[in-house]
Curated annotation (Swiss-Prot):
It comes from the Eukaryota. May catalyze the hydrolysis of nucleoside triphosphates including dGTP, dTTP, dCTP, their oxidized forms like 8-oxo-dGTP and the prodrug thiopurine derivatives 6-thio-dGTP and 6-thio-GTP. Could also catalyze the hydrolysis of some nucleoside diphosphate derivatives. Hydrolyzes oxidized nucleosides triphosphates like 8-oxo-dGTP in vitro, but the specificity and efficiency towards these substrates are low. Therefore, the potential in vivo sanitizing role of this enzyme, that would consist in removing oxidatively damaged forms of nucleosides to prevent their incorporation into DNA, is unclear. Mg(2+) binds at E62, E66. The lineage of its organism: Eukaryota, Metazoa, Chordata, Craniata, Vertebrata. This is Nucleotide triphosphate diphosphatase NUDT15.
Length: 170
């Protein structure tokens, strides 16, 4: 690499978790970000995929670390490619879906108050507007994903086009 060449940037890899509970029918667990990029936007539990970790392990770990909940029946839900050039943000996020394991605590606790205002159960059909959702969740909603359907039809034809560029890249 030439001395003045910019180092090549690579997207991050994250895992987001669509958390469901039999005690809150047709609701999904949502938090509100604070103190970091995307402050004020609504988010799912989730975070970085650790080296050597499976997607399911990451979903379990992040949900426990952030909301104090144990999950069962964790499965793949979707994948999104979120790129916002003006924010220097590019993540590929694997979305997993899981149910609260009712043999443990069934209500979320805010385990990271410096990063999240609170957790609440929100009906899927009554989600905040898209512009109030953090990138991965916004892309998931734009795909037409429905956590209460078992099919993956929302991925038909998806090529990772949830991108916001200020300039065209060749």
């Amino acid at each position: 690499m030439a001395a003045n060449a910019e180092p090549r940037r690579r997207p991050g890899v994250g895992v987001g978790v669509v958390v469901l509970s039999c005690e809150h029918p047709r609701c999904v667990l949502l938090g509100k970000r604070k103190g970091s990029f995307g402050a004020g936007s609504f988010q799912l539990p989730g975070g970085h995929l650790e080296f050597g970790e499976t997607w399911e392990e990451c979903a379990q770990r992040e949900t426990w670390e952030e909301a104090g909940l144990h999950l069962k029946n964790v499965c793949f839900a979707s994948v999104v490619n979120s790129f916002v050039e003006k924010e220097n943000y590019h993540y590929v996020t694997i979305l997993m879906k899981g149910e609260v394991d009712m043999t443990h605590d069934s209500e979320p606790r805010n385990m990271e108050p410096e990063k999240n205002e609170s957790w609440e159960w929100v009906p899927w059909e009554e989600f905040p507007p898209l512009d109030q959702l953090f990138w991965a969740l916004r892309c998931l909603k734009e795909q037409g994903y429905d956590p209460f359907k078992e099919d993956l039809n929302h991925l038909e034809g998806y090529r990772g086009e949830h991108l916001e560029r200020t300039t065209k890249t060749p």
